[in-house]
Amino acid sequence: MEVRERTKSNGKETTIVKLAIDTAAGGSFQFRAAEKQGYFEKNGIKAQLSNFAYGIDTVNAVLTEQADTGLAADYALLNSLGKGDMVVISTLTRGNEKSSKDNELLVKEEIKTENDLKGKKLGVPKGTVTEYVWAKYLAAKHINEKDITFVPYSTPDEAIVGMKNGDIDAIWSSGALKDKFKNIKGVTKLGDLESAGVTIDSYLLAKRSFVEKNPKVVENTLKALSEGVKYVDNNKKETAKLAFEQLKLPEKDALKDIERQNYVLGFTEEDAKHLEDMKVWLEEKGKLKDKYELKDKINLEALKKAFPESVTYK
């Protein structure tokens, strides 16, 4: 049963799909490329892209019916899956050595070693994977969370101001944004995600009802995204130009972001284990408000139809 609104485009019928994407981590370039190159239209999809600051904001857009699909890094995803009837329909990025090394711990000049973090104010964008990163990093360095203060912020600009005026002493940053922090007097690198023993993956999610009522639409959306991924991989400079057009990101900075992203489509046993391990940690820390089974929140039917070989999760 297809319930989507349909429109005629160049005499061809297309289905409107509202895709919420982020402007922060990697900038959702595979979505932007798929739209710009006409891949959605080719697959019968009239994509309406809407920009949000972080993945968590796209999840809220799905929960409040502003969007059909959203995307989120593992941590925000797990915290959100119990809030509404949403399902994971594919992995979008997998953390690798390159992306882990790119995500750096930047600190004020008086912090020379991990131990100097004690008594300091650590910046954390609320509800994002950085909460997990800090916890893992501090545990790895044997620093008690009681000995530090977390300072929440909601946008990178807020964090930059915080670092400048002394409200924040240390922060995690990656990609193009990193240079903005490094340009602040006395800010240096102390470590990276690899030293925290953490990888960050991100996922595509949607309302369960949308997925169940529109299987073909979801399948075609995934096909268009796959072409978007291939385009970005093979046309990094052109994608960087697109980033400048749409996000006003300087091309050389966007290029850095694109080079470190490991865009994928698929869902493997490893993807599921990554989420399950993090979910257990959240439960043990008492951070997961809603009870649910991960397996009930995964719907890979469309992905299996579009790219059967990309799914190894049973």
Language model regions located:
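Short, glycine-/small- and polar/acidic-enriched structural segments
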Residues: 5-144, 169, 175, 198
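Conserved C-terminal helix/tail region of periplasmic/extracytoplasmic solute-binding proteins
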Residues: 283-314
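Short acidic capping loops at alpha-helix termini that bridge into adjacent secondary structure
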Residues: 115, 145-149, 252
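Sec-dependent N-terminal signal peptides of Gram-positive bacterial secreted proteins and lipoproteins
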Residues: 1-2
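Solvent-exposed, polar/charged alpha-helical surfaces in well-ordered, non-transmembrane soluble domains
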Residues: 29-32, 37-38, 60, 64, ...
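Secondary-structure end/capping motifs
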Residues: 212-289
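Pocket-lining segment of extracytoplasmic ligand-binding domains
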Residues: 75, 150, 157-245
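Small-molecule pocket liners
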Residues: 94, 99-105, 187, 200-204, ...
